[in-house]
Amino acid sequence: MKKIFKNLPISKNLKFLIVFGLIKKLVILLILIYPLFSSGQTNPYSDKFAHTYSIVAKDAKTGEMAVGVQSHWFSVGTLVSWGKSGVGVVATQSFVNPSYGPQGLKLMESGISAKNALKQLTEKDEGRNYRQAAMVDINGSVGAYTGESCIESAGHYIGENFSVQANMMLNDKVIPSMKKAFLENSSLPLAERIVKVFEAAESVGGDIRGKQSAALIVVGKEKTENIWQDKKIDLRVDDSEDPIKEIKRLLKVHRAYEHMNEGDLAIEENDMDKALIEYGKAQSLFPENNEMSFWKAIALLNNGKKEEAKKIFDVVFKQNPNWKKLIYRLPKSGIISMTVKELDFYFKK
């Protein structure tokens, strides 16, 4: 700056005014270009992507609520799917504003309907044009929103107790197909209905980019005091060539372990007949799992069906000898009705 004014015949006051004017213009320029780099509506790219399709729904019969999502994006369930028993579920996607999840649940828990809760959140969000979100509350109120700047094909459909929404789809057939699948599979449990919706979306093209991750959450109709009991189902596939096939498999495994848990409770209550029934159901759903076969055999043993149990033990022990080591630890815990010596005799026969 000194070189600029070195040979000019101007006063110090004039030099000051010139420098001040340049600084003023620079400040104004910075103010004008700042919005281009801020996190407001004009720059959605600072938010995480989750261009995807999803469903939020309530089962009118059981009161369960669910949110399911699939996307060609890593770990889509991390930000998109939210739920709380006795309150509601939320899906927040497109250029994701993750605060919609916890804030939406908080508003619904305070007594505000899903529709009005979503309205409040979008009204104060400067990036609303790039958002897509949906909510269902415990009373069956449904809210859905698709910003005008969401990437096509984009939109949503609100039905009784549910909403399906999508953006960046291959075509405009995805949302109608999702809606149809949900309505036509009302006889299924809610989680299985969600999987049918996933499959329907893919059958007509799905996400224009393909598939990568999926998530499925189911919460109950009653609030729970224990946070670990809040989600009845909480499944995620973070990175897979076929996330829908994988989440379908995981749901089947989950159902098997539901029966395993019931069998464990029955053993605690010394109800061996019920334990046998529950372990048997678990094994039928997941026959290749040694854990389920082993505990079914334990239940048979405790019910006096030793020969039937022995056949299962022989298969399990052949596949993994450590299970035989485990069974010898059970008498001390009172889990089986045989002593170590009796086990020795039993297995030597």
Short names for language-model regions:
Residues 41-209, 216, 238-269, 280, ...:
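Alpha/propeptide regions of enzymes that mature by internal proteolysis
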